[in-house]
Amino acid sequence: TPLYSSAASDVYKRQGEGGPELAKAMLGKYYEIQYPEVIAVVLKGSPKPWVGPMDVALTLIGAVFKNNFVKNRVLEFIGPGVSNLSMDFRNGIDTMTTESACLSSVWATDEKTQEYFTIHHRPGDYKKIQQGALALYDGVVEIDLDTVVPMIALPFHPSNAYPLKDVIAEPLKYLGMVEEEAKRVFENNKEIHLNLKDKIFNGKIKVDQASIAGCAAGSFENICAVDQIAGKMEHGLGTFAFNIYPASQPVMTELNKTGVINDLMEYGVRVKTAFCGPCFGASDAPGNNDFCIRHSTRNFPNREGSNPANGQIASVALMDSKSIAATAFSGGFLTSAEDIVTEFHVPEYHFNEKIYDNIVYNGFGKARPETAMLYGPAIKDWPEMSTLTENLLLKVVSVIRDEVTTTDELIPSGETASYRSNPYKISEFTLIRKDPEYVGKAKEIQEFEKARVSGDVKKVETIYQILSTVGINAPASELMQTTGIGSVLYAKRPGDGSAREYAASCQKVLGGLANICIEYATKRYRSNCVNWGILPFTLAEEETDLAPDEFLYLPHIRQAVADGKKQIDAIVISPD
């Protein structure tokens, strides 16, 4: 299983991790991981025609995320129900498994898998994988596909999963729940006011926008199903905004050949190029206070492109493509695919490899070290980073008491994507949606570390004076040699969601030297912290009274790391 720099890599059967893990591998280092526990996901039966892969995925995520049942474990999909699912259906479930907090996922293979490899001109790569007669697992999740119903994940997490018919039947109850959740999520931003109850007309929820996009939704089979629902409804969209992004150029080409794209465009659907933009706010950003439905991987706060610093808020609910199509062609009123009686059939798919052969350069094993690298003026190298000193003096610059902090909150997606080649620029967005004061506070304490490195005794004297309150009275000139200065972030469970290493590297660029939490939401994020030289501390207590602007003094921390100590002592120093 190769490493891949994306949390959504499950669909390609790669292990999704942050970029530094790939860099280590390219340097000949090992990928370090404790042998994971394995959870059997036993599938039985067959899904109803109106049920899609997102419905199965949300059923799973809703059952296991909040109780941590599969956290950092490998999911192994087995059972008689697997053979009743097409490969597109399996991939649609698989790309969502990351949202369960699992480490990765694997599937039993069969004749359909073999056919899939043959279609993609790779018959020799197929391997039959089945569980042994005496296979043992660390836990079991059973899903009866016959009983899965159309689902909806309400804002602001895929685990907020409910049967779609329940939300349709009681709109005030469920939209009221989302409004209350928004108050909690944005409690520090008094400019945010989410009012979803305004979306209820004559007892029905009116949606503002719909999108189907990316690895989770843009499959050939999904989009063909949308076309067939559109044909059943026999009318156009009117003014309702419905956008579809195929998962790849080969998929788009085949949809074009079969006439599906032409059909959808005639009905008023905006069919766009292969791109996952709506998933992370890079396209189709909704209007303020809009309520959107999407078949994509995540619906975290502001991930859809709104900017809370400007008082903006929108909300995204996740649904399967079939129910999204049913809603879109019902005037935007929330509708289950179960209510649209349709016979689904999938045209034969043909993979056109020329699309990649004619555009992708395969340089593997063809090193050309003489080739000059081209750098534009906006591409910047990483700053010099200080070596870990014997002791550390850290200022608490942010305390986040949410139960889970996502990587989207640590560093937003969308508008930041264009700055990924400039570590200084992108770091300016760190925690901007959750704690707008973080960047300024981190930079303020970082100036003292810069002064320490440059030998500015006069400047660092003012920060080292705080150590005298705990009996450390050495001169600043001496402390400069032994005690580094930086910032620390506290969050209960940081790192859910994307594998993006910027969630850690941006803290480091701003002088962040440690995280403290109850537990890390994912191994990926903890590994990113380690790889960027951020100390990943945990506190067993469910709650801590650590407060912003307090200091932590960590004596002999370098030696503790070298010795592999599992517990260290720290001194909390109040600024008063």
Predicted regions, residues:
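Single conserved hydrophobic/aromatic residue that forms the stacking wall/gate
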Residues: 1-8, 12
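Mobile "lid/hinge" segments at catalytic clefts and subdomain interfaces of large enzymes
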Residues: 10-118, 277-278, 283-360, 530, ...
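Extracellular/luminal Protease-associated
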Residues: 78-82, 482-521
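Accessory "access/gating" subregions that flank catalytic or transport cores
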Residues: 79, 98-238, 244-259, 263-266, ...
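Short hydrophobic alpha-helical runs that function as membrane-insertion/retention elements
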Residues: 105-107, 270-273, 513-518, 536-539
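Short gly/pro/ser/thr-enriched loop/turn and capping motifs at secondary-structure boundaries
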Residues: 113-114, 250-251, 278-281, 300-301, ...
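Flexible inter-domain linker/hinge segments
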Residues: 131-132, 147-151, 333-408
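Acidic, glycine-rich flexible loop/linker segments
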Residues: 274, 303, 343-345, 523-576
